[in-house]
Every structure is written in structure tokens, then in C-alpha cells.
A protein has these predicted regions:
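C-terminal auxiliary extensions adjacent to catalytic cores
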Residues: 160-230
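Inter-helical turn/loop segments and adjacent helix faces that build the functional surface
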Residues: 30-40, 111-118, 145-153, 172-179
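Glycine/small-residue-rich interface belts in oligomeric ring/scaffold proteins
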Residues: 4-72
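Internal, conserved structured core segments that host functional sites
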Residues: 59-64, 71-143
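Short, mixed-charge aromatic SLiMs
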Residues: 44-57, 87-88, 127-133, 161-170, ...
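A contiguous pocket-lining binding segment that forms or flanks enzyme active sites
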Residues: 128-173
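A short glycine/serine-rich beta->alpha loop
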Residues: 8-17, 46-52, 86-93, 122-129, ...
Length: 230
């Protein structure tokens, strides 16, 4: 493996300090309402989450950001950021994407990686100074700047985000660690379908989702007791 492939593993690792563990993205509402309460309901939730919410918002955004960065199209990147800002309906999830994006960028800065001072990554962050930087977007730009193949960037991101959802289910429902691993490995058959599908989509498909995820995200803001920030 090359050095850049290890960096790809690092930025997708659960220990990479962007605060993703603090967010359930509405899952906590599903659990408190008894909708997600065991292995079977967790499997249904995870499958729909990755096929709709994750695929058409985060994964597609990462791909579009990567391709815009490859073209050095700063205007398209800024447009993508504005679309993401406008399309995330739950307030807590907007804030989560901003915070994780900001922390991702700041952590990358501290790693002293080879990132051109005149490259699109620096130009993009400078243009977004004082504004929101979404995690999926900055991730896509970073991967292109590091010359990481698009397929690798997307597959690692999909695995990492799915693993995070499974971990939240295990901790919060709760489920056994073995059940969590079974749920995660059970998603692998969907990964290839999702990755192939997302490569054929364009900006018009961005943020296509199931409204139930947004509704539970909004309801999370008013839960009496909460373990997660979203």
C-alpha cells in the first residue's frame, strides 16, 4: 500500500477527530419511539439509511466535489456547498455537517500533508473562510488533491459511514457486538449496487431522500433526554 492509501484509512477511521460519534442523525428518535428496537428493525433502518440518505446526499456530494476539484472548478464547489446548506432540513444535522467539515479541514492542516499551496484544496478552504464547510464536500476535495482514486475514496467513505451507523445501533438499542458485526457484513452486498448507482447520478439527484429521516431529525431537537447531538 502507498502512503496516500494509509492516509485514506486514517481520515475515514472512527478515531479521526471530527466528532462523528456525537451524532446519531435522527436514529435516537427512532429508538425512543420504539420504531428501531432489535436486530431486524435495525437492519431495515440501516439499509434504507445507506441506500437513500447516505447515498444521495453524502456519497453523491463527495463524488461531485471530487470531480469539480479535478476540473479546478471552484465555482461548482461553492455551488455544491450552498445546495447542501439549503437541502439539509433538520437544524442539528446541518450543524453536524458543518462541525465535522470544519474539524476535518483543521485536522488535515495539522498533519502537514503534501497539499499544494496553490491547489484547489487551499483555494476552496480560503473561499469558504467564515462559511460552512460540509464534511462530505471537503472530503471529496481532499481526496482529489491527494490523488486518491475516486472509487477508493467513495468505497472507504461508504464503509466508514455505514460502520458508524451500525455502531450507534449497537450502543443505543442496544445490541450485542456480534449482532453489530453481522449487520455490518450484511450491508456489503448493497455497497456495490450503491457505488455503481451513484456514479450514474448528477446534481439533479442530489439530496434525494426519504422524508422520514428528516422528520425524525427534526423531532430529535425536542426529545426530553438525549445521548447524541443530532
Amino acid at each position: 500500500m502507498s502512503e496516500k492509501q494509509f492516509y485514506l484509512l486514517q481520515v475515514n477511521d472512527a478515531l479521526f477527530p471530527i466528532g462523528g460519534y456525537s451524532h446519531s442523525q435522527g436514529l435516537e428518535t427512532y429508538i425512543q419511539r420504539g420504531i428501531v428496537h432489535d436486530v431486524d428493525t435495525a437492519r431495515e433502518y440501516i439499509t434504507h439509511k445507506i441506500k437513500w440518505n447516505l447515498a444521495y446526499t453524502e456519497l453523491l456530494s463527495a463524488r461531485l466535489a471530487y470531480e469539480a476539484a479535478k476540473r479546478n472548478d471552484l465555482e461548482e464547489l461553492l455551488k455544491l456547498e450552498e445546495i447542501l446548506e439549503a437541502s439539509r432540513i433538520p437544524m442539528e444535522q446541518r450543524d453536524a455537517a458543518r462541525k465535522m467539515g470544519s474539524r476535518f479541514a483543521k485536522t488535515i492542516e495539522k498533519l502537514n500533508l503534501w497539499v499544494s499551496e496553490k491547489g484547489i484544496f487551499r483555494e476552496y478552504l480560503e473561499a469558504r473562510k467564515g462559511k460552512a464547510v460540509n464534511h462530505c464536500c471537503v472530503y471529496g476535495v481532499f481526496c482529489e488533491e491527494m490523488q486518491i482514486p475516486l472509487e477508493d475514496a467513495l468505497s472507504h467513505y461508504l464503509y466508514a459511514q455505514t460502520s458508524a451507523v451500525v455502531t450507534n445501533c449497537v450502543k443505543t438499542i442496544p445490541l450485542s457486538q456480534t449482532s453489530g458485526q453481522q449487520l455490518l457484513s450484511g450491508c456489503y452486498g448493497e455497497f456495490d449496487v450503491i457505488l455503481k448507482d451513484i456514479m450514474s447520478k448528477n446534481e439533479e439527484d442530489l439530496c434525494l431522500s426519504a422524508p422520514g429521516f428528516d422528520i425524525r431529525g427534526i423531532q430529535h431537537e425536542r426529545l426530553y433526554s438525549r445521548l447524541y447531538m443530532s
